[in-house]
Regions:
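Non-transmembrane, aqueous-exposed alpha-helical and coiled segments at domain scale
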Residues: 1-312, 406-408
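Short, solvent-exposed amphipathic alpha-helical segments in soluble enzyme
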Residues: 162, 204-208, 275-279, 292-294, ...
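Feature captures the catalytic cores and cofactor-binding loops of soluble hydro-lyases/lyases
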Residues: 208, 212-252, 346-475
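C-terminal binding/interaction regions
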Residues: 252-260, 267-268, 281, 303, ...
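Residue "hotspots" at secondary-structure boundaries inside conserved domains
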Residues: 327-330, 367
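Short, well-ordered loop/turn sites that connect or cap secondary structure elements
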Residues: 329-332, 338
């Protein structure tokens, strides 16, 4: 009989979530570096460079890979011979471990979980509760998988109830472009096929916990070995999704996915459920077993596991944002790399909602946005002598509904975020001769190092969603939508899809 002690289990959960906050899995590092080596689009290669450099910096400094340190997801396989030496339930122990991990002062993680999601949406302050999936299996061990999944990729999850005769590849290739770049490619696609709707979604999520092995599968196919249905489907989807030319951060390029994972399950004769969930550039998961001998001891990657890369945007144009004018903004073209210097404002979902409500009521805003740039970000709290914790961009499309009003009524000159903007937002940018700049998702620590001072200007009660003023030095961004409304996320993938030449570009 295996006895698992309460404190050993709690501490193992805590250590696991701290561990994955700053260590990429080695298989992800290896796969991304191989993609970097073959990438031909300079913009996409630049983005991957930032992600790889950021990854190594986070590992060396034990700070989060991404400012969105995710919602905690835990898969448990509990052996039937396991006995618990505990006063708390398994769910309570998991949540205590998550609480410790996210509130540890040595590496504070961002609390992103909100209670009462349909109502007040109040932050729980410690990132609990976790999402827990538990099964009872034979044996005397507890198998644990801990994953932290950010909102940018989770929000791009898809579920469809296909007809039995529908083609899975066609559905995936039709769906991927609708997901935009908010899931921070290059990453991994997890697909669940069969069962019931909720089973398909769970399989899609669980598939993402397995190691990247697409190259081994390619070698198996090349050897002439027989492939299973799911293996053949993985290879076909891997080739064709990358042939869409979406590329790193949606900038166009050769690699959009590093692997495609598939789990399936028997389903009803009338049904063909399919779910798809992407894993982002901040891929974070770890697996371990507890056998009663004590808490887990996780082995960190070696520094040598990371490629010896440096990030230096020598082609960037330095911009003094304190003296920014519409005339200067009008001179920028999509794809231009800029290095921002001066003071920028921040604000995301909750702040924008408040600001627009104030505008609707004719109230004076707490901040003057005239000729300013606003950065869509919710930073991690600083530790030690940091000015701010990791502070990468959040998905800009969530602010689309506010953009025209903000540009028209506040004098705002530009925005900084990640991913594409919708067609109506691009029109609003053109109508107001504004600009949208893109920072790299998955490079939060790199961005934080460019922030030299930080102070809250408005809505401090919103925590990470408050309006800050950051003073930045050489903060790297790319012009994603210029003052004419042209979007790099609309033009670049089509260009690279045509260049790859596997899937015809629709006119």
């Amino acid at each position: 009989m295996t006895v698992i002690k309460q404190e050993d289990f709690i501490q193992s959960i805590c250590d696991a979530f701290q561990f994955i906050s700053y260590y990429h899995p080695k298989d992800y590092i290896d796969a991304l570096y191989k993609a970097w080596q073959k990438e031909e689009n300079p913009a996409a290669k630049d983005a991957m460079t930032q992600i790889l450099v950021n990854s190594r910096m986070c590992a060396e400094n034990n700070r989060p890979i991404c400012q969105d340190t995710g919602i905690a997801t835990v898969f448990l396989k509990v052996g039937m011979d396991v006995q618990w030496d505990a006063d708390m339930s398994v769910e309570e122990m998991v949540n205590e471990g998550v609480r410790r991990a996210y509130t540890w002062e040595g590496n504070t993680l961002r609390a992103s979980v909100l209670a009462d999601p349909a109502g007040k949406r109040q932050n729980t302050k410690d990132n609990t509760p976790a999402v827990i999936h538990m099964s009872i299996v034979p044996g005397g061990k507890v198998e644990v998988t801990c994953a932290a999944k950010g909102g940018g990729s989770e929000n791009k999850s898809k579920l469809a109830m296909l007809n039995p005769s529908d083609n899975i590849v066609d559905w995936v290739l039709k769906t991927i472009p609708t997901m935009g770049a908010g899931w921070c490619p290059p990453g991994i696609l997890g697909i669940g096929i069969g069962g019931t709707p909720e089973k398909a979604v769970l399989m899609a999520k669980e598939s993402l916990m397995s190691h990247i092995d697409i190259q081994e599968l390619q070698e198996k196919a090349a050897s002439g070995a027989e492939l299973s249905t799911t293996e053949a489907l993985r290879l076909e989807l891997f080739e064709k999704v990358n042939a869409l030319g979406i590329g790193a951060q949606g900038l166009g390029g050769l690699t959009t996915v590093l692997d495609v994972k598939i789990l399936d399950y028997p389903t009803h004769a009338a049904s063909k459920p399919i779910a798809m969930i992407p894993n982002c550039a901040a891929t974070r998961h770890v697996e371990f077993e507890l056998d009663g001998s004590g808490p887990v001891e996780l082995t960190p990657p070696r520094v040598e596991d990371w490629p010896d890369l440096t990030y230096s945007p020598d082609n960037g144009k330095r911009v003094d944002v304190d003296k920014l004018t519409k005339e200067e903004v009008a001179s920028w073209k999509t794809g231009d790399v800029l290095l921002l210097n001066g003071k920028i404002l921040t604000g995301r979902d909750a702040a924008h909602k408040r600001l627009v409500n104030m505008l609707d009521k004719g109230e004076e805003l707490p901040v003057d946005f005239t000729n300013r740039l606003i950065y869509y970000v919710g930073p991690v709290d600083p530790v030690g002598d940091e000015v701010v914790g990791p502070a990468g961009p959040t998905t800009a499309t969530r602010m689309d509904k506010f953009t025209r009003q903000m540009l028209k009524q506040t004098g705002l000159l530009g925005m900084i975020g990640k991913s594409e903007r919708g067609a109506a937002t691009c029109e609003a940018i053109a109508d107001n001769k504004a600009v949208y700049l893109m920072a790299v998702g998955g490079a939060a620590y790199v961005v934080a190092k460019a922030i030299k001072s930080s102070k809250v200007l408005a809505f401090p009660e919103l925590g990470m969603e408050a309006v800050y003023e950051f003073e930045v030095k050489d903060m790297p961004v790319t012009v994603a939508v210029d003052s004419k409304g042209e979007s790099i996320h609309a033009t670049a993938p089509r260009k690279w899809q045509a260049k790859i030449g596997i899937i015809p570009v629709e006119s």
